[in-house]
Amino acid sequence: MSGSKSPSLSGVKRKRESNKAERTQIKSKSRRKSPSAEEVDPQAEIQLLESQVLESRRHYNNIDTLLQKAKNPDPEDEATILAAVALCRVFARLLSTNDMVKSKGMAASEAVIVQWLKERYREYQDVLLDQYLRGEIALKQSVALTLLMRLVKEESKTEQEYNWNHGPFSRLVESVLMLPEDDPIREEFAEKYFKQFDDIRFHTFKAVKKFLDTDLDGEVEQLVSSNSLSLLLALEHVPASKDDIQSFFTGSKKQSKSLLSLKTYKSQAQEAWLATLRCGISKEQRKSILGVFSNQIAPWFQQPEMLMDFLTDSYDAGGGTSLLALSGLYYLMSERNLDYPSFYHKLYTLLDDGLLHSKYRSRFFRLMDTFMSSTHLPAALVASFIKRFARLALHGPPAGIVVVVPWMYNMFKRHPACTFMMHRETRDPEAKKTLEEEGMDDPFNMDEQDPMLTDAIESSLWEIETLQSHYHPNVATLAKIISQQFTKRSYNLEDFLDHSYNAVCIFGPLQVS
């Protein structure tokens, strides 16, 4: 019958289809098993390649294989870092055995091998610097820094006087200076090496100066100088004597003879700082520099007069920057015997109407207390400062006035020649009568910029007597100390600084003994 099938035939067909399905399933299982069966452990493979290189020169081509693995840009490939670390060990071994050094009388075939190894070594450094250190993967950056510094150490072991310029170190410093400003690897370099070892500091100074002296375009120069500044500011300690130069990354003092000269050491730091400052800095960077100038920067300079232009430019910036600049100038005058005749003239010009209202008022008075501490200052000069502050206090906020009065008290104690400004009396009856009827012109010239020419010494402190009637009771009470006997040795200004108007009110009634 047409359309009907023999049972035997249909059974055979089903059997064949069943067998086909079985074979397909078996084949599929086989395919799934094959990767795991042939899978190679990356760590084991790299260890094998490394050990073969170290065992025999016949396997030097493994170096190229490891380089290709280290270059793999895949961030998920764990073999890249393993290969980079293995190569570091390989080249450390080759350096220690002088297998990358050409010698006189060496056979041409040997020279070819040495040259090939040098090229691979250079290629390896390029991978660490360009692909790892300047990349965006933090782990690779940190690994590259560690491996490059290991190479520096290994290279230094093979030479009596290690040439830092020809090794990876100068390229490493340049790469660190080219990183984005917020890159954490620069801080890691500073913490682990720059701040820890004298030889690293010394040669970083040289590398910074050399790099900044090259022809960099505008944006690159700004980036490099900003990173250089960040690096230099990380140094908080300045060696005071030869005995402070004790820590060496590359070995014994014998290998770092130039470092044993404190003069040479400081000279390199000075050159690095000058190269950085010449590139231009922002307002905030200038403030950062001035804030640590006396402790972290000026002590490096053998020729402190080279900082004068920087400080003068900083003074011209105005505001709190001017005050910080004068602080730096005062350090050079008092500690380094630098002559700066216009110092007090410049300081006097900062006493303007906004001073007692400014956010840096407390800092100003702290520094003023230092600047005016010498008892050898001319009475006419001291009188000008006292009188100008008295005039500014008339329009100042209570929180500012309560600093001015104790500061004046301390000035009178240090400079007794100015005290008659408080008790200037007219004894001639006729002159006294004229004053009472017509009043008098204050001889003090508020517009004069030279503190030696203001005639303040001929004036009196009527401003402070006026403040004794101030609306704020604490200000009025404090102002009265100028009219009383000076039995107190001095006031601690810190007790009156950093207070707002509300804080002055919270004091409650002020008792002045």
PLM feature segments, named:
Residues 3, 11-347, 371-373:
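Alpha-helical solenoid scaffolds in large eukaryotic transport, assembly, and signaling factors
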Residues 1-6, 513:
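Intrinsically disordered, low-complexity mixed-charge
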